[in-house]
């Protein structure tokens, strides 16, 4: 039988683990190898000395604590704290806008009774009454007046054990600190023309950006880091902040080393990455209430931007990996809204963006080292997608958000319609963000991640700014370009090939002769006969079989086998613990998931549909375990796959694992299975439809779900190649004997061939329908 190929792939999956283990052992071993490159013209090895190179950044990193600076008069920048560190009592700092605000800070030592002191403020003598009741802490006092000749008033004192104070200009105000350490907080004074206020500091001070205000508060309450209190820290003039430091250029081409034929070039580039996240939405047939698949797919995007006064043409390809599959079913009725599968990317997912531009850096990107990149993060939010139903209110999938964080960069290859491009692949890890996504008018709500329904949220693209640096081995002659095929590090992107191959496979369905299909489906098909039609198979047969099994191991069919094995083990354990007849019979739940309560007479129709649908999804495995002489769906599926592989002009050893795995999951999605009990037949489909009828009259009888569940354990499962509706139509129009009916029920290939050779339109239409379901 042709379905032997699927059983072999399932039975030999252990070889995948062995292969992976062997590769891991080989990768973990280190071996020193000395290579003698020989004459330069007769070797592919680089005749250069691989130096460490350098990675320079165009981004200025602002220090957290800038200073200390010498006492001076200057206009502090807005949104920067001026952290003052006086060593003795007296005036600490004073500032004015020369209009309506004169403000100064005075420091008073501990344990000072109320007394009047004379201070020089803004060039004039002023009598200020001060006091400090604290025995240990110093006291900062804010004195302020609103006219040049006005009297000073005192505000917001700060009792400090650290002897530190801070002021800042921000949003039309002058901010200070008040209270008592270690619980000091900020206070402010409204000031016009606040940005023109000059400060005169009488002590050493530091500058801290407002973005680090929490750190400034920490210093005020707990003191400066110990390193700032050593004699080696020497204050400098504030004018040192005005020194123009040389920053890295937006475009840099640096010569690292050079020989007669080769040279090492370091390329540093500021880049802007724009990308789109594409999706595919497939609606099921029928009345228009079902969607079969909503998934992500790779997307190419071409754009241009200005870099260093030069227009750069760029191209990106965005793809995702590690998607999470969700589904929703509103019920079993044809008019119930349902989505069989929709994909969501979450924390366990990755987004890949392949980037290329027309600069010199990408011209010879073949032998590369010291590859590094720094990129910003970007948030991707989901938009609203309405499921257009024929009647009723539309369900709407809305919300969902993730943030992309840079997680690495490698070399890759982008495939466009006309050319292959060496490019950089930027890998992004994900973190989920608010809001969660939901499907309005359904029970789906509060789920986190980004669904594939509308990942761009009406935006044309997402944008990330960053910089990359690499050292590339290039020919010394700038006019020569290293051939792209020499690269051994690029990743061959198969998605474009697979898309074309799927289209070819689907078009080949119409070229397969129905009369030959049954004969070919009965032939034993093993792995090597399956691969015999592919070029260069003999040389790569072993590795190709391993690759096929490695991919097949992750298929839904293989996962179902693993789940079923665990269920059977649990069921066997329950039998050993209890000797009752009911417990032994309950082992059927391993195949069916039907509980003991399923025998309740009052079981609702919807409940039966759900149970029979659950059973049907596992009957494929049961049929594989109890092979009969009849033909089954997997025989047709495997033979269709084999025939299409032989006829295909695009299949390769790289795309074969994908095609076999997809075919095992997607060929003939609408399957119906039956169990024969004397003259009664039980028939169920994976979409929840069920029939029970007598063979002699084809009259329906009540469907006993518990009896059906019990029969699953002991009776062979048969693929309903000719389903109940087709049988009834055949009997009503042509009339068939009881023997013919039994043979068709058992999917006897001889009887099927006879009806096809007689050009029976009903049987031919059913087989043609199965052939057309063999699509990707």
Swiss-Prot record:
Residues 248-479 are annotated as: Spike body and stalk (antigen domain). The record marks 101, 190 as: Binding to sialic acid. GO terms for cellular component: host cell endoplasmic reticulum-Golgi intermediate compartment; host cell plasma membrane; host cell rough endoplasmic reticulum; host cytoskeleton; membrane; viral outer capsid. GO terms for biological process: permeabilization of host organelle membrane involved in viral entry into host cell; virion attachment to host cell. Residues 484-511 form a coiled coil. The lineage of its organism: Viruses, Riboviria, Orthornavirae, Duplornaviricota, Resentoviricetes. It comes from the Viruses. It comes from Rotavirus A (isolate RVA/Equine/United Kingdom/L338/1988/G13P12[18]). The record marks 231-232, 241-242, 247-248 as: Cleavage. Residues 65-224 are annotated as: Spike head. This is Outer capsid protein VP4.
């Amino acid at each position: 039988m042709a379905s032997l190929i699927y059983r072999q792939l399932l039975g030999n999956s252990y070889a995948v683990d062995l292969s992976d283990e062997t590769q891991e052992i080989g990768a973990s071993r280190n071996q020193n190898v000395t290579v003698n490159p020989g004459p330069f013209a007769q070797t592919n090895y680089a005749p250069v000395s691989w130096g460490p190179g350098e990675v320079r950044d165009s981004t200025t990193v602002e220090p957290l604590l800038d200073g200390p600076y010498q006492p001076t008069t200057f206009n502090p920048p807005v949104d920067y704290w001026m952290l003052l560190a006086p060593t003795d009592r007296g005036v600490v700092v004073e500032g004015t806008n020369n209009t309506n605000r004169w403000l100064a800070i005075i420091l008073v030592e501990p344990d000072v009774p109320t007394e009047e002191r004379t201070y020089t403020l803004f060039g004039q003598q002023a009598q200020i009454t001060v006091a400090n009741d604290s025995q240990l802490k110093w006291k900062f006092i804010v004195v302020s007046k609103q006219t040049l000749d006005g009297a000073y008033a005192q505000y917001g004192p700060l009792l400090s054990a650290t002897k530190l104070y801070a002021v800042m200009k921000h949003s039309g105000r002058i901010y200070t600190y008040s209270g008592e350490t270690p619980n000091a907080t900020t206070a402010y004074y409204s000031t016009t023309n606040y940005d023109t206020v000059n400060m005169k500091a009488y002590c050493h001070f530091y500058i801290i950006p407002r973005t680090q205000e929490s750190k400034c508060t920490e210093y005020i309450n707990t003191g400066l880091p110990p390193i700032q209190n050593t004699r080696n820290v020497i204050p400098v003039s504030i004018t040192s902040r005005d020194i123009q430091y040389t920053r890295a250029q937006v475009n840099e081409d640096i010569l690292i080393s050079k020989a007669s034929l080769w040279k090492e070039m370091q390329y540093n580039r500021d880049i802007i990455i724009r990308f789109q996240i594409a999706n595919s939405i497939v609606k099921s047939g029928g009345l228009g209430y079902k969607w079969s698949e909503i998934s992500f797919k790779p997307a190419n995007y071409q754009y241009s931007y200005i870099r260093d006064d030069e227009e750069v043409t760029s191209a990106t390809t965005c793809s995702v990996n590690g998607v999470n599959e969700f589904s929703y079913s509103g019920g079993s009725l044809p008019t119930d809204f349902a989505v069989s599968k929709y994909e969501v990317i979450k924390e366990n997912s990755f987004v890949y963006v392949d980037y290329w531009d027309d600069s010199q850096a990408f011209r010879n990107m073949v032998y590369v080292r010291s590859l590094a990149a720094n990129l910003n993060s970007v948030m991707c939010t989901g938009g609203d997608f309405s499921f257009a139903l024929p009647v009723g209110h539309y369900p709407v999938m809305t919300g969902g958000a993730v943030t992309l964080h840079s997680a690495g960069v490698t070399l890759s290859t982008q495939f466009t319609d006309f050319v292959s491009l060496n490019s950089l692949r930027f890998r992004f890890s994900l973190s989920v963000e608010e809001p969660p996504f939901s499907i309005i008018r359904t029970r789906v709500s509060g789920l986190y991640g980004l669904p594939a329904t509308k990942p761009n949220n009406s935006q044309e693209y997402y944008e990330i700014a960053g910089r990359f640096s690499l050292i590339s081995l290039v020919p010394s002659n700038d006019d020569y370009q290293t051939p792209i095929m020499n690269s051994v590090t690029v990743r061959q992107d198969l998605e474009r090939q697979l898309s074309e191959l799927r289209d070819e496979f689907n078009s080949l369905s119409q070229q397969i002769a129905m009369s030959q299909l049954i004969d070919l489906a009965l032939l034993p098909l093993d792995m090597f006969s399956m691969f015999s039609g592919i070029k260069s198979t003999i040389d790569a047969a072993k590795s190709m079989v391993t690759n096929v099994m490695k991919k097949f191991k992750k298929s839904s069919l293989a996962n179902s086998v693993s789940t079923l094995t665990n269920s059977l083990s649990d069921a066997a354990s329950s039998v050993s613990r209890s000797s009752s007849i009911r417990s032994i019979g309950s082992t059927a739940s391993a195949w069916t998931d039907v509980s003991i309560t399923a025998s309740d007479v009052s079981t609702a129709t919807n409940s039966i549909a759900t149970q029979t649908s659950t059973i049907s999804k596992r009957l494929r495995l049961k049929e594989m375990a109890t092979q009969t002489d009849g033909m089954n769906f997997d025989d047709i599926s495997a033979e269709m796959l084999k025939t299409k592989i032989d006829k295909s002009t695009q299949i390769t050893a790289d795309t074969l694992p994908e095609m076999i795995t997809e075919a095992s999951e997607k060929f003939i999605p609408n399957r119906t299975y039956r169990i024969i009990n004397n003259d009664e037949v039980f028939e169920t489909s994976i979409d929840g439809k069920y029939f029970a009828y007598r063979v002699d009259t084809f009259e329906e009888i009540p469907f006993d779900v518990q009896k059906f569940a019990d029969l699953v354990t002991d009776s062979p499962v048969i693929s309903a190649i000719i389903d109940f509706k087709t049988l009834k139509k055949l009997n009503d129009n042509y009339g068939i004997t009881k023997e013919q009916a039994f043979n068709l029920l058992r999917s006897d290939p001889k009887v099927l061939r006879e009806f096809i050779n007689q050009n029976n339109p009903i049987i031919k239409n059913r087989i043609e329908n199965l052939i057309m379901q063999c699509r990707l």
